Amino acid sequence: MLIGESAIEPVRVSEKLHQTTFWQGRGGAVTHFISGIDIALWDIFGKVTKQPISRLLGGRYRDRIKPYGSLIMQEPEIFPPRLEAAVERGFKAIKMGWGPFGRFGDKMDEAIIRTARETVGADVELMVDAGGSDRYWPHGYKWALETAKMLKQYDVVWFEEALRPDDLQGYIKLTENAPLPIASCEVLTRRQAFMPWIEQRAVDYIQPDVTKVGGLSEEYRIAMHAYDHSILFVPHGWNTAVGLAADLQLVAAVPTARWVEYITPAPYVEDIVAEPFTLDEDGLLSISEAPGLGIEWNSDGVKAHSGMELTRSDL
């Protein structure tokens, strides 16, 4: 399906792959695989034309974006050092996810959030990811609504993955009634799966993952469909430097984007590229104008984490 194809027509080639893998099932691992191919084709397209992907998508609305440091929650008595390390790195926004939250009772949940707010202070944005896509997630709408009310008291920016990832009707009710923005959809694949969530306003913030949905070709279409329905695009990015570089190009090309996810600490983000991503004094990330994704490999870092020796063709 790929041999002999053009390497500078990512949208058409990716759509061909979606169409011709129909019998293997649309979505899931097949779409994850296509995502990697699509991102690579966009990088090639950018390098051939000597343009950043964001410009090839239609233009750049910004040159910097606020990253939120994304980290796993811990019990309140041991959590502060992890939060302090993120603040020390320069993050002005932090998302806390999974860990014990939602798994050991409401008192534990509030103690974690109270500790986090007291640790980072009033000027750092806090986001909460309950991890409702975790296996056997036990909670439904009533828990999510009451938890959202608690989070509002601590000035949490958004509440993510409060319900199981396929609970469309629950999310519609929660988004309508919660006192703070609701975010979800990181596990969905292909733009067709996102349409009911956007068109029925099931979330305030939509979170496609470029390494899962079909790559840049699909995610840009999802982001602009959300924009047309006044839903904020916040890309999910719990992956590698390639995912972050792709997300940065996307948020540059979407009019209302405000944040990008940045795992912290993140050896698979920081160690495998020649020029690591760095936050400026305002806590923002610059969005590269170099061709393609705007990154080059650090072959030593790739070898250290994967055992692979990069050849010239890999670079």
Residue ranges: model-predicted function:
Residues 38-76:
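Glycine-rich, aromatic-flanked loop segments that form ligand/cofactor-binding clefts
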Residues 1-48:
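Metal- or metallocofactor-binding catalytic centers and their adjacent structured scaffolds
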Residues 52, 66, 125, 181, ...:
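Proline-centered loop/turn at the N-terminus of a beta-strand
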Residues 37, 50, 94, 129, ...:
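Conserved, mostly hydrophobic/aromatic
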Residues 64-173, 177-178:
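Metal-dependent enolase-superfamily TIM-barrel catalytic cores that perform enediolate-based chemistry
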Residues 5, 12, 155, 166-183, ...:
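Shared catalytic-loop signature of beta/alpha-barrel
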